[in-house]
């Protein structure tokens, strides 16, 4: 059977996280509603400032000489993180997830993968924390700390009165611009055309972001991972749905 290099690479990407790894949690025990109200009181602990954040609780001594610089916002069951981790072993990456059971699942999965690959030291660069990124992003990250931020299949909040709850808004984009370094990248993808247009509109109108061209997107190896790495993306594929990516670059601050 003829197998293309792209397919072989995809199989290799998924091999380390397959169900044959001992101790992997079963997703059926960690099911929770697809989205959570970001404005509810979730009793979440968070650091007073980034200086109060102890990342060694998540990465151990792997933090030596490193800072977290990839952030997957609303990481779900961690599919993208598991794809990114072995490809970018020198980058610390964090998944931020508001749902308790889902973040517990991702943590258990990471611990199982670390144990299984202990000799090689794989997956030490990935972690998850339960938090509300819409409220506490600046509490975790210093100015210009992040190089990449991911927003994959976020809650569309269809009703007009709930659009203010969307993860991409003018106010939130200013916070993202604060923690994202110049030249850093925001990756978005959704299966909801209206939400795609909303995100593109607000990112395009913000003075600190510019959209990547089609040619630039083709050269970025991460872009292809956005489509199928997550459970939500795979579900959209099974249902023959459309997917719309939009990638933006953080521009330099304007001269004073």
From Swiss-Prot:
InterPro entries in alphabetical order: SAM-dependent_MTases_sf, Trm8_euk, tRNA_(Gua-N-7)_MeTrfase_Trmb
- Supply the EC number(s): 2.1.1.33
Q: Which pathway features in its UniProt record?
A: tRNA modification; N(7)-methylguanine-tRNA biosynthesis
Kindly state a single biological-process term from the GO annotations of this entry: tRNA methylation
One Pfam family, please name it.
Methyltransf_4
Which function does this protein serve?
Answer: Catalyzes the formation of N(7)-methylguanine at position 46 (m7G46) in tRNA.
A cellular component term, taken from the record's GO annotations: nucleus
Coiled-coil ranges (or none): none
Q: Localized where?
A: Nucleus
GO MF, one annotated term: tRNA binding
**UniProtKB keywords:** Methyltransferase, Nucleus, RNA-binding, S-adenosyl-L-methionine, Transferase, tRNA processing, tRNA-binding
Instruction: Show the segment(s) annotated as Disordered.
Output: 17-45
Q: What is this protein called?
A: tRNA (guanine-N(7)-)-methyltransferase
Superkingdom of origin organism: Eukaryota
Q: Which organism is it from?
A: Caenorhabditis elegans
The entry's active site is: 155
> Among its keywords, does the record have Thylakoid?
no
Catalytic activity as recorded in UniProt: guanosine(46) in tRNA + S-adenosyl-L-methionine = N(7)-methylguanosine(46) in tRNA + S-adenosyl-L-homocysteine
The keyword DNA repair belongs to this UniProt entry's keyword annotation: no
What gene does this protein come from?
metl-1
* Enzyme class (EC, first level): transferase
Main location (coarse class): nucleus
Positions annotated to bind S-adenosyl-L-methionine = 74, 97-98, 132-133, 152, 230-232
Compositionally biased spans, kind Basic residues: 26-36
């Amino acid at each position: 059977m003829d197998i293309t290099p792209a397919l072989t690479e995809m199989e290799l990407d998924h091999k380390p996280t397959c169900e044959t790894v001992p101790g992997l949690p079963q997703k059926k025990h960690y099911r929770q509603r697809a989205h959570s109200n970001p404005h509810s009181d979730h009793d979440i602990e968070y650091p007073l400032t980034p200086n109060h954040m102890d990342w060694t609780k998540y990465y151990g001594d792997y933090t030596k000489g490193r800072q977290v610089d990839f952030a997957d916002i609303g990481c779900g069951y961690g599919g993208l993180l598991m794809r990114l981790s072995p490809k970018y072993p020198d980058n610390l990456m964090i998944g931020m997830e508001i749902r308790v059971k889902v973040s517990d699942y991702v943590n258990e999965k990471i611990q199982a993968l670390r144990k299984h690959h202990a000799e090689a030291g794989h997956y030490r660069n990935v972690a998850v924390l339960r938090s509300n990124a819409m409220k506490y992003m600046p509490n975790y990250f210093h100015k210009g700390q992040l190089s990449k931020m991911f927003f994959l299949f976020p809650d569309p909040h269809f009703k007009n009165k709930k659009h203010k709850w969307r993860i991409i808004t003018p106010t939130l984009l200013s916070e993202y611009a604060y923690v994202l370094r110049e030249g850093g990248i925001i990756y978005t993808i959704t299966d909801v055309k209206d939400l795609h247009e909303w995100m593109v509109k607000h990112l395009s109108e913000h003075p600190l972001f510019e959209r990547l061209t089609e040619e630039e997107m083709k050269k970025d190896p991460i872009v292809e991972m956005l489509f199928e790495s997550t459970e939500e993306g795979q579900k959209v594929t099974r249902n023959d749905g459309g997917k719309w990516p939009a990638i933006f670059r953080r521009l330099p601050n304007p001269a004073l």
